[in-house]
């Protein structure tokens, strides 16, 4: 009993051994199999010596879960959560506990991946279809996206759409009304500058005085005014102007829809529907347009199709618009969006139903009426004559009001011109109105909420003009009218969850996606009120905990990347790419080299790379790769020399998208630098770098980091994500700034790329916890274990499938690519067949046909145990044996378990199944592991072509429920 030291006994709580899947004995067995003595020996065999770090990271020691929680609890306590009336797109909300516990805090929802495999994602696809239905009903338009990143970036996407579809082809002006939220205008201006658009800002009525391709209006505006735009929109549309509207989702419950006024595009934040402010995010933006603009929509769209049995099935529609297919010609670079938050918003609408939403919205509006009536009774002047939830007040002693507000622990909006704003929300109580009277008027005002309410009821309210009161029904679909009891809601959420395969069931080995453990201990702080309920524009001295957390996380990321500074603002990897390219662009401009606009991109690059380059106003020149998948150095030298005068940068991924450490990476950086360019190193594969090498050490100038890959933020079924960028010192002055929050950095006055100054700050505690708990040694060991797992899988599968690319010593990095093209030629079995057959074995498919068509790219991550790796390997070996039966003719090419996969309960219940040349057991219980823990796909293979030819992106018709 005394063999272990006290130090060893104290380490039982260390997170490291919980995060890494293989235990020490499993690791040794795997090392023996791949032919390495230790993790360090394997690392030396794989990572080129020239780029290997000689020093350890300086993060600190690994720690236990209890210690990590205690430390971050101390940070949380430094935040002062005042009652917020700031508004400006961020509002207090009540997260229904049934959604908090069963969605936000449920790994069945937050660990899933984007539904590229729809047969095992029907649950979240239905939830997102509900979100699209909510968006369409409230905006009065035809087609909604599955979510965008935030309201401000949605505005930039609306501007881009307007230019694409406007018939005013010669126009180059985008008009923005001067009463939109300032952060929205900031992001629009940043995007417009890249596109070469002119942005004109002025009173809404002046839009008709310009030759425009598009215009943007806020409904209700930043001051709270509600305007009937019907005549203005008609006049603009007669001039071929695309009319876009930023709308408040809660107000639309009561107000005439922008679509009914004639808008072409309506967007906004769904945050008010049960998603905490989170110091700026994450929140889902809704984006809705007329049907005629569907091919120009940004982001994912969920559509209805049918499966092989003719049953209704959901899928991602019209994917040919998106970056992973169209690359630099895509409508947008958006990849990860905000699916988890969109799910929360859709469930909020389902749980409350139309009547509940009307009650919530009416209560907010009634409190605004009461506040206005009391203030006006005391002679206070309002800027706005109409309102839903926001009052803008003039003529106050601002200093005195602010002092009383801070003493009462509340934050109001204080504009530069002396206007004071008050925005009410779902959390507002009667006592809050009393407190607001005290703060605005001082003590002794004599106002009584009940008396004011009685007066309003007796006289009626005129604050929403009669012409702007919504007359049409909303959310009449049965889904929004049957789950208002918590029992029914809980079961509905569970019913949808059970249709989806997430990390809580099995490994998701998607190459280039890094589906590692999202540990419970990392997730816990996210829903703490000290982090969840902070307004992003609150005084910074109230956010000392957030400030310290962001500073510590930034310093750790600087250490990990080898850069000099980090910008946290980008709220997705694609936005990080855009932000990094903007920094390069601004840097060249500062040196008088504005003409440098060519971006070199290897042909193997992620689709977001060329899409982001196009977004940043750059011209893409593609460079070749050799047969080993490496950048063709001779072609790079030739291209770099040809465009040297105008070379802006290269975008390159490391390790390469082919899953190997290119030996010539430093030479690649040198070639670009010699011709005056900068090196953008895509951080998608950072999970193979941390602690072993770094972008800065390699020679890159800027990278984005996918916190939702390398640093443990969950994918959420398609978001949230975070894409902060690391930069060398010469680029630091050119990273994103923010028009509202200026913490005193050299980059403060630069344009923003996201609505909030720190992006989706509410999920930063996840990555902070991940790094804090693992420490320097744990981070390095995680990377080394990722390499071990990948090489173990690669070597095992290489006995049955060709492995397409290998690096030094016949090794791969953190992922491997198996080549299915020879099998397809010999048997007719496709990569799609294998992907769907894996569903029958209880697995999500690896990445299909990227970066090479006809392949599968497998990334197991460090979190998977040898037991799980072996289960996946056994499935792939079994599938190879099935393919052999097709090759031999034992099974027909058009009637076999692969061609017919995935199999459902309906299949094995079908009497006609007996005509198939394989048994029911082979179909649905192909392995012993599946027999004891079966995941059932709920639909058969989905017909993608039918879905796009018969586009339907709303809930099922009522007849389906009759």
UniProtKB/Swiss-Prot annotation:
It comes from the Bacteria. GO terms for biological process: glycine decarboxylation via glycine cleavage system. GO terms for molecular function: glycine binding; glycine dehydrogenase (decarboxylating) activity; pyridoxal phosphate binding. Its EC number is 1.4.4.2. Belongs to the GcvP family. The glycine cleavage system catalyzes the degradation of glycine. The P protein binds the alpha-amino group of glycine through its pyridoxal phosphate cofactor; CO(2) is released and the remaining methylamine moiety is then transferred to the lipoamide cofactor of the H protein. This is Glycine dehydrogenase (decarboxylating). It comes from Shewanella sp. (strain W3-18-1). The gene is gcvP.
